[in-house]
Amino acid sequence: MKIIRTSTISISLNVLLKGQLKFLSGFFEVVGISSGDELLDEVSQREGIKTIGINMERGISPLKDVISLFKLYSIFRSEKPIIVHSITPKAGLLTMLAGKMAGIPIRMHTFTGLIFPTRKGLVQKVLINMDRLLCSAATNIYPEGQGVKNDLLNYKITSKPLKVIANGNVNGIDLNYFLPEKISVLQKDQLKKELNITASDFVFVFVGRLVGDKGINELVQAFSQISKNANRSKSVKLLLIGPLEEHLDPLQPETVQEIKNNPDILDLGFQKDVRPYFAVSDALVFPSYREGFPNVVMQAGAMGLPSIVSDINGCNEIIVEGQNGMIIPVKNSDKLKVAMEKILSDTDLYQKLKINSRPMIQSRYEQSVIWNELLKEYKTLLKENNIDV
């Protein structure tokens, strides 16, 4: 019995669904479809599944979208899956439409994050209608968390039932992988030496794409003021872990200049293994404008780091104010600065947040729980469609 999982770009299959595809392949024949590149090859080798490369544009591109749609349709007709299950917006729209055209009985889409709530005018209307079209072609719809579910309801995207798997998130956290003890003292000391981190440094870390939507402009502005404060009792550093995407939602020129010129800001680019950087850091700062259910906040928590996050979907579900982190308003560098200064100066609060961080991830987002709940959902849908498992 065959299941096809799709995403717009291969990094989503490679990172967001790491391990899950291999788990599912123990019960089904699993095929992964995304943009064809070395990351998709890595998915195939690591997960032990067949992969097929199809380029899908992330932005609105009608002609290229039609080409991708018919390529998917052709593959679905050839592969004959029982279930197609998509993540990410464009792959969701194209997969659901192609799946319906090809007569696939079970067409599932997981909304991992919504773009339209942060847009206005004509662009917002177009995005809303695209998601409505996606939902009309899907048989089953899964918001990644309660916040995403609420937005789908509030904007009347669909009247179909909406179900959150387990406690939310598409893949959960591998707590044996994101374990502080996995990074040795020697590894930490070597990395600190490379990055010139001293014992007196309080290290903030951000992990993600360096774009405006991730709140990087506000983060750099807030940190710049803190780092230049001559009266601070501790020195500070900010690690930026992630690619700079200049073609999509570029940073403000003054932000780019500050990143280049401030010696306390370390722009380290994309890192395949983020654990060592969590291990030498003291707190995650994640002031994103929109998310579905951000893995990085859970990963940081599993590594024992408290987080400062914006009050958005997912972030405000993972973080409980004053328990395992702090929640600040979106697009507010002043409030972000206050929160960073608070966590920097209030030792008792910081220790409380730090102690709670891993247990609060462990109790809610263990990976095996989410995988088994998804498997259970697949089997339920097959039974409802009178398909023998």
Label every PLM stretch briefly:
Residues D41-Q45, N229, K237-D264, L349:
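Short, structured helix-loop element that forms part of the nucleotide-activated donor/catalytic region
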Residues R5-K64, D151-Y155, P161-V164:
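N-terminal strand-loop element at the rim of the active site
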Residues F270, Y289:
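Aromatic "clamp/platform" in nucleotide-sugar-dependent glycosyltransferases that forms part
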Residues I52-G53, R132-L186:
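Donor nucleotide-sugar binding/catalytic pocket of nucleotide-sugar-dependent glycosyltransferases
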Residues P306-V309, I319:
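Short hydrophobic beta-strand element within catalytic cores of glycosyltransferases
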Residues E321-G322, M326-S333, K342-D348:
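Conserved acidic donor-binding segment of nucleotide-sugar-dependent glycosyltransferases
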Residues Q190-K193, K335, K342, L349-R364, ...:
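A short, well-ordered alpha-helix in the C-terminal region of glycosyltransferases
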Residues N14-G19, F202-S227, D334-K335:
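A conserved mid-protein helix/loop that constitutes part of the nucleotide-sugar donor-binding site
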